[in-house]
């Protein structure tokens, strides 16, 4: 800023100071100074008249401040002045009444122009020119102008020459009067507290006292402070312009008061008998007037009386200090009491409009009810009370809807007579009684059983929660009178009675003893009751043959049951009968003994055996036990004999002692039980003498020898009969074993027999033929002639020879004769080592001592010899070659015969005698053949020589591999014709040693498993049968490339899924993954071989996807493996409740659409609570602000009303349809500010409209208390459909709709915010009947949701 700028500033400051001084000298009553400031921007200020203009060369437009100073004189002196003249007005115009002085200063650097205009009145009135003050002011202004002019001249001579100014300039103080000007520096040296080039900028005083901010030297104070230096406290709202602020406190003007002077002061400060409220007195009771100085009656006697010296004289029917209370009735008395009603009477004034009778049980939780009667009544009967309860009864008088104080009484109803007495079960000694429970509280029950004859009886007392009782210890068949009485304190209800007769008892302790095969003895204990007869029934278990029944007289306690079937299971039952009543039967089972076999007999006998036979038992015996021993009983023997087919069974006892008597016992055996034995004695035959032989004979005698009989005998009896027929006998002592018969006929043939005898018992005979005199061997017999042997037999000589000599030799070769010495007892001989096809001469002589008989001569020709050294060669599956050596004897040809050893025909072929081998063809493979060979000459055939041979096995055929997979292949082949025991399969791959597999011979296929994927295999195979092995067949195959395994979709969201798998065993190049959706979209991806998972992104929501994956190796691809998943976790496509929405992933509470029973045609919008106790709740009622009217008619409650996002009722029809889907649970949430409780019921259902939407709830849990169970099973009621059991219409009385009873303990559809008794939203066990709950939500959820959501059933946490 140049010197001109400083001058301008100084000038402005001087002018301002002088004007302030001028204002201070003028008194308020004389003159007034008005200052107006105008701010404008302009490019130039033109000079007009005597005004000067300053042309700025700044690039920016200057800022112009116009200051107008109006100096006014008092109105009383008729001084006037023109105000706020514009600096742009034409200053040359004549104005005789106004003297103006205009000055203008400009600052080049800041481009700020100050214009000052001072208006002084001149001719308005005589005071304008004569005022001494004004003259002094004008003089000071002129002096200031001169000082400014002088200062400018001084600056123009040195450093301030660049500054130029035009116009009317006056004196401006040096450095704004706040410093000294230095010509050396051509600048100001400011005093303390000032700064700037001309010292015009002040520092803020005291730094604003740290209570404000300094801006351009001025303090901008904090809100609590004021003053130049912010050191003064500010008064509240600046005392509302109605007082002075002194040290931050207001000193208020009249008639104001208060810390900010905003309140009006009350007259006389309400005389100390009231409170001041904004200038108005609120008087205390008993005082009135503007300043509460006047006494008055309370509430002006409420208009129901007149005031007299501050006291109210009330009209009839009213009372109280202000006559506001209605006088209560008097002399309340009880005229009658029953179990359900109380009759009351009272006295009251005639002015009463009506009476209100309030009654409530004294027990905790009792519901308070009311009844209204006209004012001219003096009594009432309260109905539908609960029996056995004590009631607090209050009677109010009502005049003009005002209730009096009550007159009260405490009255107890009588106990009700128990109802529904019935007998549940009746036995001989017990009776179970059942009756209906009471719905009210009482102490207990008393039940008595009194016999009809009044002899004795039983009395029992039971708890009140018991409604059934089982009385034991009664007499059977007795009639009892049963009484049930309710007890409470000292009171007893009238009894309910019924008669009952116990069942007659039957016989007990039934016992069956002395059971045989056909008889059983039954015993029992007789019944205690008097009966007409005893009924005994018995029959086979299972009902076969029906039952046999006997009627027995009561004294009997035993009976013999006969004609039973042996070995059978019987059931016997015994009961008692009186009139038409039959007791419960006592029964038991028993099994008859097995009957012994009958008619035991001996069929035939020998010396060592007995043939036994007997008739079978009637019982179904499986076998018979035969026990036998000699009568001496030295040793017993047992034999089990199966039951024979037919009526009898036979067995043979062997290895017995001859001639011995045996004791035999036979028992029938059935199911490890046996009958008593049937016994008999039987004797074996005597043992016969054996080996009876003739040792010598003469013309008249025959000597005999025999083997001694083994059993005990008395003697032997020898009978000998000649051919003439006259027999003779002789007795021989038992110790003899030889005897000679004498005096026989010479030359006669005798038949000799010998027997052993013991008493009258005789053994079988042994017989021999003998001759007296000499009988030579007559001829030789030849048999079994072969090529090298012959069998020779002959007859006995007589007398017997000492030895025999047999000679034989080929005919014409007597020199080769051979001799054979034979024992005299021999009757045959076999000659061996003979030559084939040779005639032999055979002679036999008997030697008797020294005498040799004439030889007996015979001849025999041996047969031709067979071929020798048979061998088999060149064996194939259907042919072989037979070789042999030629026989010695001449022959015509060979006969070769062959056939399978098992089954098959015999085939023969003739081979010339010159051939020694033969090829047999057309044989069966792997078959054992018997091959025989003999030589034939004429009709004579040699012996056959045989051998066995197996043909070779034929190979299985057409071996192929089918059904090839990565790890399996099915081998199939055609079986060979021959029998196969096993197949041998050898499986090889690459250079690995083969794996040998043995397969059963009946199979024609085999499943190869556990193969390596993508591997080339070679299979060789042959068949075996015993030692035989077929030829080998082979095939090749390659397993397929195995697919990836265990393809799984996890981490499925609404738009992505993680696909993972296990790699295949084979080496691969990559994977080909394809996924497609149900809408037809399809995408294929190539995945690296080392990857085992991929995340699919950008999927569609709520869409079913199929993922296909296969491995690839060059051009080969594996089979597909697949999996499916559904995005969005949509478990239920059409959720039928909020729980299913929650399981679908919908976790935000709000409005959702459900589909009843999952059907698209039955959709319903509901509000879902997804957070409370696990979420999934359907909210069907909400009360929260009272914006929705719940006092509605039946039709509204059926269909529902309100806003699901605010207050609403879902509708009874909808609630019924939802709960009909399954079992639901109920939760009621209630809040009062920060206090929250809930009630939970594990079952909830609302029936249909035909049942009037009855409510059904289950067991309670929670923190609110159980108030809803009182309404269990109640139909719904509205103002136009009264379905409760109360005298009044509960819905109408309590302005709601609910499942009322008589009337309610919860009224969640009541009037919002209404705290009158029972009128609001009540839950009795939480807030009682006189509090309206601000927030209520009723909600339901499927009971099974806790399980299906994967959570264990847990106890509710409070």
From Swiss-Prot:
Pfam families: EGF_TEN, EGF_Teneurin, Fibrinogen_C, fn3. Gene3D superfamilies: Gamma Fibrinogen, chain A, domain 1, Immunoglobulins, Laminin. Residues 188-199, 219-230, 250-261, 281-292, 312-323 form the EGF-like domain. Residues 1129-1344 form the Fibrinogen C-terminal domain. The modification Phosphoserine is found at residue 724. Glycans are attached at residues 55, 176, 180, 198, 271, 278, 302, 392, 470, 581, 791, 869, 874, 1036, 1046, 1261. Transmembrane segments: none annotated. Residues 127-157 form a coiled coil. It is found in: Secreted, Extracellular space, Extracellular matrix. Brain-specific. The EGF-like domains mediate interaction with CNTN1. The fibronectin type-III domains 3-5 mediate interaction with BCAN. The fibronectin type-III domains 1-2 and 7-9 mediate interaction with SCN2B. Belongs to the tenascin family. NCBIfam families: GGGWT_bact. This is Tenascin-R. It comes from Mus musculus. The lineage of its organism: Eukaryota, Metazoa, Chordata, Craniata, Vertebrata.
